[in-house]
Amino acid sequence: MPTFEFIAFDADDTLWHSERLYADAQKRFAQLLANYHDPEWINDRLYQTETRNIQHFGYGIKAFALSLIETAIELTERRISSQEIQEIVGWAKQMLNAEVELLPQVSQIIPRLASQYPLMVITKGDLLDQEMKIRKSGLENYFQHIEIVSQKTLETYGKLFKKYSITPSRFLMVGNSLPSDILPILKLGGSAVHIPYEITWLHETAEQPPIDQTGYHQLETIGQLPPLLERITQNKE
């Protein structure tokens, strides 16, 4: 019997690059408003707007674009032109149409694990955008279930455990976000593997659990996941 009933993966910045697109757009945004404020102030105000808007628009590129526009209007005191707003909309379209670039070793590791464990994706964000990226990734058929959610909370995971009759102690979540992918799972009694990404959005930061906490593991790359699973299996035998 496999050690885990399910291994679930976050998608953005766990299976493929995503935050790079946002970081690039944020740099262009700071350049667009350079005549009004310095980059640090612009980025700080944008973060405040994004945080405030999550309850209204959720996560994803469309929500990000709306926050860019709102911030631009505020910071320019309504002096931003319609042409400049159209430029921001253009960035969002470019982001939505961007190719999906898998992280190193993902294309080898996911098929390998799919032959040994039931796999699923649990990702948050805009439904249409996430569905499109999953299709573009070429990984869709390796996952038995794909769940696109608005938030990753204790309640969200609890409902998914109930939906799929999952025993928390036999569930493993793999992701790059401590508050979204790791901490809720540990609180529910599951196991979690944190694989930090090169860029971390401020909203996804949190204090790291003790390295010796039961069920918690940290890796540098997804390529280290199969050996970790082997060690976990051996320790439970």
Predicted regions and their residues:
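Asp-based, Mg2+/Mn2+-dependent phosphohydrolase catalytic module
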Residues: 1-4, 83, 107, 111, ...
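Active-site neighborhood of HAD-like aspartate-dependent phosphohydrolases
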Residues: 1-45
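An amphipathic alpha-helix signature
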Residues: 23-30, 65, 69, 127
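Short, surface-exposed acidic
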Residues: 34-50, 77-88, 142-145
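A metal-dependent, Asp-based hydrolase signature
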Residues: 49-94
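Long amphipathic N-terminal alpha/beta scaffold segment
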Residues: 87-107
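Glycine-centered short loops/turns at secondary-structure junctions
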Residues: 116-117, 189
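Conserved phosphate-coupling serine/threonine residues in phosphotransfer and NTP-handling enzymes
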Residues: 123
